Structure formats: C-alpha cells, structure tokens
C-alpha cells in the first residue's frame, strides 16, 4: 500500500455478477463504507429496475450516492467524480476504507485515472429551460430525434445509433446546457493516479452470467418492476433521460399499449445481456483489474483473496 495516497477498493463487474454482496461483506471485514459507482442508483423511486441495495441488504454498512436525485434530474461522470472524491476524503479521515462498487465504467475510470471532466453545473433557472426544451422533443421518435441532433452535432450523430435514445438525448442535453458540442468535449486522462487503488473484478462464464441475468429479470418483475415503471410514468417522468435506462424503457411501450408484455420482457432480458457484454469489454480493455472467478471461488474465498491483496 502507498501511504502517501488514500487507499480505496474498487469492485467492478457486469450486471448481476454479485458486486453488492461482495462489497458489503468486504466492508464488514475491513471497516469500510460503500460508494455506489452506478449511474442509475442515484435516482429516488427507481429501486427495483436498478437493483438498488435494500436497507436489509446493507446490514448496517453505510452506503453513499444512493437516492440523492429525482428521476428528472441529470447526473454525469463529472458530478460523480466530484462527489466521490469528497466522500473518499471524508471516509478516509474517519479511519475507514472507501469501497467503490458499481458497473458504470466511465464513472469508475474517471475517478481512478483522474479524468479532467467539464463542469456542466447550471442554475435552477437554466436547468428549468433545459428541461422545457427536452420536453418539447419528447414527441419525436428515435429517428426524428437523431435527425435533430445531426442538425447541430453531426459528429455525435454519426457515433450514436438512432435507437440509443438515451445517448442521443444526452448529446442534445449537453448542447442545451453548455452551448457546446459533445463531440468536441475533451476528456483528459492524467497518468498520475489520485489513489492507491485495489481494483477487483467479478467474472464468470458467459453462460452462467446470462442465466443469472435472466433469473434476476424474472425476480425484478415478481417484485413489482412493472408497477414501479407505471408509477414513474404516472408521476410525469416518462420522457426523462433516466427512464431510458434498461428495465424502464422496455416496459413503457407496454404501459402505452404499443407492445405486448411478453415481448417487452424478452427485450429487457436481451438488452441486459448485451449491456453485461459491453461492461465486460470495457473493464477488460480499459482497466487493469484483478479478476476473481465467481464460478470457482466461494464468497469467503473471494474475501480472503482481497484481504490478502490489501496486506
């Protein structure tokens, strides 16, 4: 361990890999507190679809960056990095170990490798205008929205598939907030890391992972995911960027009578599997991770391996 830098543990892995359980049990062992590195768990009222940790699962371990925003608020890597850095300082100063657990690769990467990210903070009045502008576009279908983006940011439009509505909206929102093009944004990676980082990843065979994902989707639906999405739509959040997340965007057409339930569930499972594949590609290609094989290691074995790495 480098005593000149704050020590942090980061646990990454694809959706449904078991990051929550591992991080909580590790926190018990090493006197840690957990910072969520998930871009969706910051939102209130979006619990089941984001697989948000429950108070019972927390088992007394403090968790941070969960339930801090409303679904119509925006959150970016910049906000995450700023908040996480403050939390790491606070947790470390109290003699505890910060544990960052999550699957949003850019968020984790920006923190570990000290990306310089642009501040998108706006006043409440400016944010209100941005929301009004975005609301005026909600009637557009995916292709029309993509065409709108191409009118002022052709480079971003070329790099984003029309069906990826969330990323298209993100590029448009960025322009509305900053008057700049997302395609021109510079993301500078520093080569001096801020932290002494132990980066742990959970992996397993694709067959096992996909089976876990399919099972978890079924459990989410049994626990009321459809009703959760209904309530968010009823509360007026349907057009928000947060509602383009996997688990929400697939069920909205069912609520609106545009798709049958069974097809939406199949889409949800497929999109979740595809997302998990993208997550693993990101972590394998862009980060130096110490991988733990969940299929051949029990929870206790993984905890022992991590604590050995810390010593």
Swiss-Prot record:
Site feature (Interaction with substrate tRNA) residues: 104
Q: Which reaction does it catalyse?
A: adenosine(37) in tRNA + dimethylallyl diphosphate = N(6)-dimethylallyladenosine(37) in tRNA + diphosphate
- State the needed cofactors, names only: Mg(2+)
Region (Interaction with substrate tRNA) location: 38-41, 166-170
Q: Which keywords does this chain's UniProt record carry?
A: ATP-binding, Magnesium, Nucleotide-binding, Transferase, tRNA processing
Keyword Transferase in annotation: yes
- Keyword ATP-binding tagged: yes
Q: Tell me the residue numbers annotated for binding substrate.
A: 15-20
Q: Which InterPro entries match?
A: Dimethylallyltransferase (IPR039657), IPT (IPR018022), P-loop_NTPase (IPR027417)
Gene Ontology molecular-function annotations: ATP binding; tRNA dimethylallyltransferase activity
Name the EC number(s): 2.5.1.75
Q: Which residues bind ATP?
A: 13-20
- GO aspect biological process, one term: tRNA modification
Which Gene3D superfamilies does the annotation name? Answer: 1.10.20.140, P-loop containing nucleotide triphosphate hydrolases
Assembly and partners?
Answer: Monomer.
Return the similarity comment: Belongs to the IPP transferase family.
Q: What does this protein do?
A: Catalyzes the transfer of a dimethylallyl group onto the adenine at position 37 in tRNAs that read codons beginning with uridine, leading to the formation of N6-(dimethylallyl)adenosine (i(6)A).
This one is known as tRNA dimethylallyltransferase
Q: Which organism is it from?
A: Staphylococcus aureus (strain bovine RF122 / ET3-1)
- This chain is encoded by the gene named miaA
């Amino acid at each position: 361990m480098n005593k000149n830098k704050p020590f942090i543990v980061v646990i990454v892995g694809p959706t449904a890999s078991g990051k929550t359980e591992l991080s909580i049990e590790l926190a018990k062992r090493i006197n840690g507190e957990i910072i969520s590195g998930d871009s969706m768990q910051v939102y209130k009222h979006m619990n089941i679809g984001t697989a948000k940790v429950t108070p019972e699962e927390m088992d007394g371990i403090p968790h941070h960056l969960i339930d801090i925003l409303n679904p119509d608020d925006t959150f970016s890597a910049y906000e995450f990095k700023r908040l996480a850095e403050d939390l790491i300082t606070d947790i470390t100063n109290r003699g505890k170990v910060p544990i960052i657990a999550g699957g949003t690769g850019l968020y984790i990467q920006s923190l570990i490798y000290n990306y310089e990210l642009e501040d998108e903070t706006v006043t409440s009045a400016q944010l209100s205008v941005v929301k009004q502008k975005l609301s005026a576009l909600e009637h557009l279908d995916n292709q029309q929205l993509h065409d709108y983006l191409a009118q002022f940011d052709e480079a971003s439009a070329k790099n984003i598939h029309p069906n990826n509505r969330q990323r298209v909206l993100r590029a448009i929102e960025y322009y509305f907030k900053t008057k700049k093009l997302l395609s021109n944004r510079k993301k500078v990676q520093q080569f001096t890391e801020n932290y002494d980082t132990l980066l742990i990843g959970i992996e397993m065979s694709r067959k096992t992972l996909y089976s876990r994902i399919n099972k978890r989707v079924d459990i989410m639906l049994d626990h009321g995911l459809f009703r959760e999405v209904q309530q968010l739509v009823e509360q007026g959040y349907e057009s928000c960027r947060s509602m383009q997340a996997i688990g929400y965007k697939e069920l909205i057409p069912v609520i609106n009578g545009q798709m049958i339930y069974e097809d939406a569930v199949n889409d949800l499972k497929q999109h979740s599997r595809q997302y998990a594949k993208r997550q693993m590609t990101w972590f394998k290609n862009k980060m130096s991770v110490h991988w733990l094989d969940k299929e051949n290691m029990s929870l206790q074995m993984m905890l022992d391996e991590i604590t050995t790495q810390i010593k």
